[in-house]
Amino acid sequence: VRVLHVVTDMRRGGLETMLMNYYRKIDRNKVQFDFLEHRQEESDYDREIKKMGGKIYRIPRLNPFSIHYKSTLYEFFEEHPEYQVVHVHQDCLSSIILKAAQKCGVKVRIAHSHSSNQDKNLKYLLKLHYMKKIPKYATQLFACSEEAGKWMFCVADFDVLNNAIDAKRYIYSSEV
């Protein structure tokens, strides 16, 4: 099974490191992670992903107003029917990607909340509009905590998927 993770990029942020912690530990003979990145430049984890057998695809930056962005997204899903599991990590704007995946026949569409709030600026109202649509297009809702799930999915049912942390890296060492 190939799972397509939709991310901004694979730099060394919290979400990206969590995904890599899972990726390093899964049985890659049974499940393979591929990544759809919204940046054109290479990211920190890209080489490691490729070494482990993952593929990296690039599309333009996520822009809810761009016809070019949306057509590129639809083209991607139409050209890659092998992806029957799409796991989207795009916060409030995940519904845009989930809708395209649904219309192109992707059977399992996961939205994942990684935060429990959003800056209350001018963009917030727009993001609320898209956030409310997430449960309509997702088949599964995940959150890193109860708070993150309640914030992003409101009253919809979601599952908490705890962040993968390599605890051995944080064990006390007298040598340090």
Please describe what each predicted stretch is.
Residues 1-176:
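Membrane-interface segments of envelope glycosyltransferases acting on lipid-linked substrates or membrane lipids
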